[in-house]
Structure formats: C-alpha cells, structure tokens
C-alpha cells in the first residue's frame, strides 16, 4: 500500500516522462504484491493478470517516450505539447496506452486492478480503500501527462518539424495496442492459462493453514 501511494505521489511531481512511467510501474507492482497477499482467488488471479498487462502497457509507454526522444532528444514533459496537431497517429496510440495504464474498462489494465481490489475488499476494507485511492492518483498522473504532452500548448517550434511514426514504429505500437485491447475485451483465453495454477495454489495454502491450526491446537488439548 505504501509503495502504491508513495510512488504515485512521486510520479505526480515528475517532469521527465520516462521517470514518471518508471514510478508508475512501481505503483502497479504494488497492486501485484497486494493481490498475492490477499490469498484469495480473485486477488492472485488479478496479480498474475496485472503482471502480464503491465508488461504490455509499460513497454508501449516506454517505446512512445523513445519515439519522441529519437526526434527531439528530450524526455522533459515541458518540451512537448500539442503533439496531436502534428503527429496524430502517435498521439492516438499514446492515448490508448495512457488510458490502459490508468485502468480504463475495455483495456487490459482494468481487469487486473479490479480483481486485486475485489480480493483486497474481502480481507481488509482499509487496505482496499487506500489501494483504490492509488487508482485515483494513477488516473491523475496519466491524465496530467497526456494533457501536457498530447493536448497541451505547443511552445517548442521544433515540434512542428517532427515526423509521425514510421512503418516499423507503427508495427510495434499497433501490435502492443492490439493485445492491450484484445485482453481488455476478451480476457478469458489469458485467464484460462493460469486458472488451474491459481486454484492449486489456493488449495495448497488452505490445506497448510488447516494443518498449522491443527498442530497449534494439539498441545493445548494434551495439556488439558
């Protein structure tokens, strides 16, 4: 929970796009940890799904930073602004990835966080509410980033000269966008790949918990 809240607040203060995305990655891994330690089916499934989803989304966002860095050699947010007016294809894909990162329904970023929170609410209302606040912070820094970079005011004259994404960049980014949207709308194939393993893990945990309780209670009964 501390990792989620703290790194989300740090991300809000970043002026460097790459650092902002890096801190957001730490926050998202906080949800993975939270889901695992709920020891619930929903929480653990959400953690696994979140790891896979975040791998796609973070890779896409880092690639997006690399694309504009290759053109203007700057990762600073204030270097950019109004990119939608000059490189619309890039801007459209960046928007998809940013919305996925904040957990918009219909993207792979939604289901993982939803399942983790569902598992957390079963165990601790306070922890779940704090994690939900982290989701709000995540939406804040991703929307803040998108507003300034994609829809902000263009103060740098060099932006007007840059080229939109080339064919190889289109292939990479569109492929990532496809899987992010596909697993957002149709998560079942991915969920089925680890459903058996999660059920087995939960079963083993519950068995171990029962056995430990039996061992604890036996000395008490013998002493009586």
Residue ranges and their predicted role:
Residues 113, 169, 218:
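Acidic-residue sensor for enzyme active/binding pockets
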């Amino acid at each position: 929970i501390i990792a989620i809240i703290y790194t989300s607040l740090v991300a809000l203060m970043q002026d460097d796009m790459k650092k902002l995305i890096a801190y957001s990655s730490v926050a998202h891994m906080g949800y993975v940890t939270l889901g695992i330690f709920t020891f619930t089916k929903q929480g653990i499934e959400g953690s696994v799904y979140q790891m896979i989803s975040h791998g796609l989304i973070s890779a896409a966002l880092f690639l997006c930073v690399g694309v504009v860095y290759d053109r203007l050699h700057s990762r600073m947010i204030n270097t950019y602004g109004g990119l939608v007016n000059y490189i619309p294809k890039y801007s459209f894909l960046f928007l998809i990835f940013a919305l996925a990162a904040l957990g918009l329904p219909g993207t792979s970023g939604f289901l993982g966080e939803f399942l983790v929170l569902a598992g957390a609410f079963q165990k601790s209302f306070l922890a779940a509410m704090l994690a939900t606040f982290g989701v709000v912070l995540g939406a804040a820094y991703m929307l803040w980033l998108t507003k300034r970079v994609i829809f902000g005011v263009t103060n740098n004259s060099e932006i007007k000269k840059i080229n939109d994404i080339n064919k190889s960049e289109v292939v990479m980014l569109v492929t990532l966008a496809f899987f992010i949207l596909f697993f957002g709308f149709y998560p079942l194939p991915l969920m089925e790949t680890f459903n058996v393993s999660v059920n087995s893990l939960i079963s083993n945990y519950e068995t171990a918990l029962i056995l430990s309780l039996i061992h604890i209670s036996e000395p008490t009964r013998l002493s009586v």
